[in-house]
Amino acid sequence: MLDYEIFNPYEGLIFDMDGTLIDTMPVHAQAWTMVGKKFGYEFDFQIMYNFGGATVRTIAGEMMKAANMPLDRIEDVLAAKRELSYQLIPTQSKLLPTFEIVKSFHQKKPIALGSGSHRKIIDMLMDKLAIAPYFNAIVSADDVKEHKPHPETFLRCAELIQANPSRCIVFEDADLGVQAGLSAGMDVFDVRTREIISPR
């Protein structure tokens, strides 16, 4: 049993969404497989896990390259993935145990969501799972110029919740996200190992 008291010293808590707070990854995998079939290609959804935390455009490009699909069709692939995501994700996603940490610190510490997902998907999930009130700030892929592993997402979160980045902790499930948190000068709680990693 994790003792949440280890998070007491931090000014602000910043959470990744996909795979950390909400179990969307199997749905994304299903959607990628369906998109590949639609275009007559076999997409390896393992690539999505390998590039966890990356933008959908980056993941699409890597899948297309691996499947020998011409990259000039990336806009068609992205449109198909977007449409399927809007259909599948809100109906099939559920909260992960990490959300108990959010509930535990709600109204005690400022809490931000820093995600590589687009705002529309985040808003749909917030509505479906009725969790929007738990967050003081939300930063999506649409709100930043640079994406994970760049620290911009998490630095923007810290700015919005008015917390010193070095006094924040990031909760992540993917290597790119862990790297982004450490690059932002923040401690990172890796939900896979349940350990805190420090940039210092």
From Swiss-Prot:
<dbReference type="GO" id="GO:0008801">
    <property type="term" value="F:beta-phosphoglucomutase activity"/>
</dbReference>
<dbReference type="InterPro" id="IPR010976">
    <property type="entry name" value="B-phosphoglucomutase_hydrolase"/>
</dbReference>
<dbReference type="GO" id="GO:0050308">
    <property type="term" value="F:sugar-phosphatase activity"/>
</dbReference>
<dbReference type="InterPro" id="IPR023198">
    <property type="entry name" value="PGP-like_dom2"/>
</dbReference>
<protein>
    <recommendedName>
        <fullName>Uncharacterized protein HI_0488</fullName>
    </recommendedName>
</protein>
<dbReference type="InterPro" id="IPR051806">
    <property type="entry name" value="HAD-like_SPP"/>
</dbReference>
<dbReference type="GO" id="GO:0005975">
    <property type="term" value="P:carbohydrate metabolic process"/>
</dbReference>
<dbReference type="InterPro" id="IPR023214">
    <property type="entry name" value="HAD_sf"/>
</dbReference>
<dbReference type="InterPro" id="IPR006439">
    <property type="entry name" value="HAD-SF_hydro_IA"/>
</dbReference>
<dbReference type="InterPro" id="IPR036412">
    <property type="entry name" value="HAD-like_sf"/>
</dbReference>
<dbReference type="Pfam" id="PF13419">
    <property type="entry name" value="HAD_2"/>
</dbReference>
<dbReference type="InterPro" id="IPR041492">
    <property type="entry name" value="HAD_2"/>
</dbReference>
<comment type="similarity">
    <text>Belongs to the HAD-like hydrolase superfamily. CbbY/CbbZ/Gph/YieH family.</text>
</comment>
